[in-house]
Amino acid sequence: MDIILGVVMFTLIVLALVLVILFAKSKLVPTGDITISVNDDPSLAIVTQPGGKLLSALAGAGVFVSSACGGGGSCGQCRVKVKSGGGDILPTELDHITKGEAREGERLACQVAMKTDMDIELPEEIFGVKKWECTVISNDNKATFIKELKLQIPDGESVPFRAGGYIQIEAPAHHVKYADYDIPEEYREDWEKFNLFRYESKVNEETIRAYSMANYPEEHGIIMLNVRIATPPPNNPDVAPGIMSSFIWSLKEGDKCTISGPFGEFFAKDTDAEMVFVGGGAGMAPMRSHIFDQLKRLHSKRKMSFWYGARSKREMFYVEDFDGLAADNDNFVWHCALSDPLPEDNWDGYTGFIHNVLYENYLRDHEAPEDCEYYMCGPPMMNAAVIGMLKDLGVEDENILLDDFGG
């Protein structure tokens, strides 16, 4: 009898707890549809289910807000203005949004939870962003760890981007083995030296990342990217390799690939000031886009130079392209500096880190380095070194333009 009574009491307690949870859920968790009002325009309103994030709700309605980190809250790009219904700003957002901006309603769309009706404001250019399923034309090594991915835009479509802009590329769930990569013989030595073929990338969900375009607007019908493989650091070889770069390196001619865009803010200023471009690694992409656009589309007569840093001649690419531009345009010169030239390179050009080379061979004796505009993209250490050098020369922030994607 005591056992039966105990079972009954236990069951009643469980049922009571379930009822409490259901009651709390009915009060705390929103049900039914919610409406997102956009730019005070009824035709732009979005009706969706509660429970997700604002970034996903916008994407589901065909409104693609830039998010280089794929919604993780680390890039700070998916900024929107939430006028009501977004709740309190989260600590994860305060790394990217000042207190003053927060008071104005600035939020990261990837961090805003969908709980109730919401009123938001988006930049008008967002509505020009589209999504395309592209076809891989080619995916060739340009350096030991850099591929040039060339995508064909669907017939009849165009991506209305500006030089220095970027797109977002989607990687589906995948299992990629580095051993399956087709690495040309000239680059295999380093891959084997660092035992890179042992790595795999296994991902169970879709991932989105941003890449700057290497082509310029008059190279119609294509998107061209420079993608550096993101292998684990030598001092921590057991961490997972880069999800997106691993996927991109696995693509072959004829494969399909989904992109969205265009996005961007790393655009050239419309002035007559001298332009100094500084790049390294896959930071070549926006440098090529900008320089080609200035010289081949705009036929600019602005004085400009390009300074590119690489390890050895094996890591130099687009050399013939830039040599041709320099030959055809008296206002353009370019230089490459090798930080670790190989004996077989027989290199007689500049050596060392590019920020030192730029300073020692040009800016130190420049009559007004503070009047130039500096456009740069490269590894974080290069960017920091160049910016530090420019600050020492008295260059103002407004004349230092940085693309953070290309390292």
From Swiss-Prot:
GO biological process: sodium ion transport
Broad class of the protein's primary localization: membrane
Entry-linked InterPro entries: 2Fe-2S_ferredoxin-like_sf (IPR036010), 2Fe-2S_ferredoxin-type (IPR001041), Beta-grasp_dom_sf (IPR012675), Cbr1-like_FAD-bd_dom (IPR008333), FAD-bd_FR_type (IPR017927), Flavoprot_Pyr_Nucl_cyt_Rdtase (IPR001709), FNR_nucleotide-bd (IPR039261), NqrF (IPR010205)
One Pfam assignment: NAD_binding_1
Record: residues binding [2Fe-2S] cluster: C69, C75, C78, C110
Transmembrane segments: 3-23
General function of this protein: NQR complex catalyzes the reduction of ubiquinone-1 to ubiquinol by two successive reactions, coupled with the transport of Na(+) ions from the cytoplasm to the periplasm. The first step is catalyzed by NqrF, which accepts electrons from NADH and reduces ubiquinone-1 to ubisemiquinone by a one-electron transfer pathway.
Protein known as: Na(+)-translocating NADH-quinone reductase subunit F
Annotated organism of origin: Vibrio campbellii (strain ATCC BAA-1116)
